């Protein structure tokens, strides 16, 4: 196997045809990273979402945006419709964007409320851990225990940035 670096820019909405298969590129801004690209296999109603959504794993949000993720999911679902969503990690699912979006909202919304109420990140973390959208994943999600504090902190920082 020979690794070949990308040699052209891919644009949102661009399509590539390979025989009977057409691939459509989707980019709606920052979600997991600023350069998230999803690839829809048009005839099969399957979209590879990469790390934009994960199944039973917490995503690295260091360069991402919670609000951007929610907007990305909405735009992608509106453009692509009902799909089998294939994550970069975990099993494909028709409900992946909804399910992972609910989990991410369970982190972001309590952080936003803590910021709006003038409470610290510790309160946000406690409320995130009590949120049923998050709590139901605490025992089974890969990387949950070692990463949830960091992701609450990132959500809190993003909420603070938006509030100012």
Residue ranges and their predicted role:
Residues 78-80, 93-164:
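Accessory terminal helices/loops
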